[in-house]
Curated annotation (Swiss-Prot):
It comes from the Eukaryota. The keyword Zinc does not apply. The chain crosses the membrane at residues 22-42, 162-182. Keywords: Cytoplasm, Host endoplasmic reticulum, Membrane, Transmembrane, Transmembrane helix. This is Dense granule protein 3. It comes from Toxoplasma gondii. The keyword Cytoplasm applies. Direct host-parasite interaction occurs at the cytoplasmic faces of the parasitophorous vacuole membrane (PVM) and the host endoplasmic reticulum (ER) membrane via GRA3 and host CAMLG association. Direct insertion of GRA3 ER retrieval motif into the host ER membrane contributes to the host ER recruitment to the PVM. Signal peptide: none annotated. Its main location: cytoplasm. It is found in: Cytoplasm; Host endoplasmic reticulum; Parasitophorous vacuole membrane. Coiled coil: none annotated. It is a multi-pass membrane protein.
Length: 222
C-alpha cells in the first residue's frame, strides 16, 4: 500500500514545468466557480424572498416622497409636510437672479459716471491752478536751436565748432516740449490711458450684452 502511494506523490511533485505554470491560472478559476455555486445556493433560500404584497422598505421614509407626472412632489406621512415645487418656479428664480444682476450693473454704471464727472472737475481745477509744464524748456531749446542754426550759417568758425548732431538733438527736444505744451489742456481734461492698456483693449473682444439672455428667457416664459 505504501509502496503504491509514495510513487504517486513523488510523481505528482515532479510534474512537468508547463503544467506547473498552469496552476496559478487554474486556482483562481476554481475559486470563482466555488464562490458562484455558494452564492446561488444562498439565493435559493426562502428567507431571502419577499412577498409581493408587502411594501418595499425604504419608500416613504427618510424624506423620500413619490413624484407625479407634473413634477410635483407629494408629502409623505413620515417626512412631514412638504411644499410642491413646479418646474416653472426654477425658471422664474433664474430670471429674477439675472434681473437683479442687471440692476446691480446699472447702479455700478451710474456710480462710474459720477466718479468720472468728479475727476473731470478735478482735472479742470488742476489745469486752472497749475502752469503748463515744459514751457521754459521748450523756449530755451527753441532759442538754442535757432542760435546754433544761425551761427552755423553766418560764421564758419561756429560751423566747425558746433557739430550737426547737436543741432538735430536740440531740434528734436524742442519739438517734443512744444508738443507737450500745446497738448497740455487735452491731456489734463481727458482721461489718460497707458500705452499697453490701450493695445490690450484694442485686441480685446467686446463683451456680449448680458441682458439679452434675460429678455429671451422672459419671452419663452410668456
Amino acid at each position: 500500500m505504501d509502496r503504491t502511494i509514495c510513487p504517486f506523490f513523488i510523481q505528482s511533485f515532479t510534474m512537468s514545468t508547463a503544467l506547473k505554470r498552469l496552476i496559478p491560472f487554474l486556482v483562481p478559476f476554481v475559486v470563482f466557480l466555488v464562490a458562484a455555486a455558494l452564492g446561488g445556493l444562498a439565493a435559493d433560500q426562502p428567507e431571502n424572498h419577499q412577498a409581493l404584497a408587502e411594501p418595499v422598505t425604504g419608500v416613504g421614509e427618510a424624506g423620500v416622497s413619490p413624484v407625479n407626472e407634473a413634477g410635483e412632489s407629494y408629502s409623505s406621512a413620515t417626512s412631514g409636510v412638504q411644499e410642491a415645487t413646479a418646474p416653472g418656479a426654477v425658471l422664474l428664480d433664474a430670471i429674477d437672479a439675472e434681473s437683479d444682476k442687471v440692476d446691480n450693473q446699472a447702479e455700478g454704471g451710474e456710480r462710474m459716471k459720477k466718479v468720472e464727472e468728479e475727476l473731470s472737475l478735478l482735472r479742470r481745477e488742476l489745469y486752472d491752478r497749475t502752469d503748463r509744464p515744459g514751457l521754459k524748456r521748450a523756449v530755451i531749446l527753441s532759442l538754442a536751436t535757432s542760435a546754433a542754426i544761425g551761427g552755423r550759417m553766418v560764421s564758419r568758425t561756429l560751423r566747425d565748432n558746433i557739430p550737426g548732431y547737436f543741432v538735430v538733438i536740440n531740434a528734436i527736444l524742442a519739438a517734443y516740449y512744444i508738443r507737450k505744451v500745446l497738448t497740455y489742456r487735452r491731456r489734463v481734461m481727458t482721461k489718460r490711458q497707458p500705452f499697453m492698456s490701450s493695445v490690450k483693449n484694442f485686441f480685446r473682444r467686446k463683451p456680449k450684452d448680458e441682458g439679452a439672455g434675460v429678455d429671451k428667457a422672459s419671452k419663452k416664459q410668456t
